[in-house]
């Protein structure tokens, strides 16, 4: 759907199953698949037997990157630090074989230690810390791993935060925007991107501003 709507990018969440980064948001299987229990209990065989829709298991990151083939940006949110090495492997494969440029593949995480790990394995690759509060030092948390952007919560993003991030050379990308009033407010604040569930809805509002 995102490709059909010509979205600028796709956001997805990955967790580690065996030697694959699997695209799944929740820690548990029951909400988004026909499985039960924790994702961490899966092995390769049990993952392949899951039904996440149309009889298919949740895709791996490598499978999705091969399908997207550089047509848009992909934001990879790390849901567990243990997946870092596998995500680095998949990023290298996507750049080498699937038509992506490095700047199209940003890695984000609430666990900033995971971004430090990734920065050590893949120096200079785009990373963005996720934050859910407006910190006293604003966007300073992005500096230890040379981030290119910071991903902030819609309810806590204000002008002081945006100005501080921009002064540090960071893009500000805000998640997850579902209300027109918030979209307009963020546009006026000068944020660089927003995460939305409905691309056509957001474009319709922004085109009128």
Feature roles, as predicted:
Residues 1-209:
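Phosphate-group recognition and catalysis centered on beta-loop-alpha active-site segments
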